[in-house]
């Protein structure tokens, strides 16, 4: 994700339920919207990665309702954003122009008003919406919209990002539309949250401990080590993942 530039694509954030997709997307959006938030990041590498986008974007984030088409929902939400910022553009629901052409015109109007800013449009969860549209026989009419939103990110300051619990392209219930899915895939970059990522956050953010506290945990676990075959190989990981229990505080 950069501020404008060539060969840009939409962003698909992939992670199973509870892995923090919304938190990750929210973090990106907070920094992109306000450069002051960059200083709150504890990880130096994350700060370096996000420095180029800090404070460069305006953001509109929403959750999908399931009772309308994707294009109708997206244009309604973008229109709400445009109107709230006095940007002179109106989507015409009867227009014969392509999705891409309308998005291009919208961004031209946005940049006329805010030439030094980009626009992030973010949806928390896409997969359930697409599943329901597939069940009602409407998936194939939604995929061109996804393709157009991803393509609109190229050579503009528009960024479209959404969260999903698994890769859309490999979901079994969507394989009847495999050809169109491949075209959609070409317009997005995949950002996956792995199990190791979640474990790291838990250890470093939620269960962070001093070396003295870790030593107490190691001593406490020693009598139980023989009962678990893989405890020796994962002793450090287990110590990192144990919470700061009352036992530790009593020892201290």
Where are these regions (language model features)?
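Conserved lysine of the Walker
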Residues: 21
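Hydrophobic positions on the alpha1 helix immediately C-terminal to the Walker A/P-loop
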Residues: 24, 28
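Flexible phosphate/Mg2+-sensing switch loops adjacent to catalytic phosphate-binding sites
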Residues: 11, 29-58, 85-101, 164, ...
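Phosphate-binding P-loop
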Residues: 2-11
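Substrate-gripping "pore-loop 1 plus following alpha2 helix"
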Residues: 135-148, 175-176
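Walker A (P-loop) phosphate-binding loop of P-loop NTPases
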Residues: 18
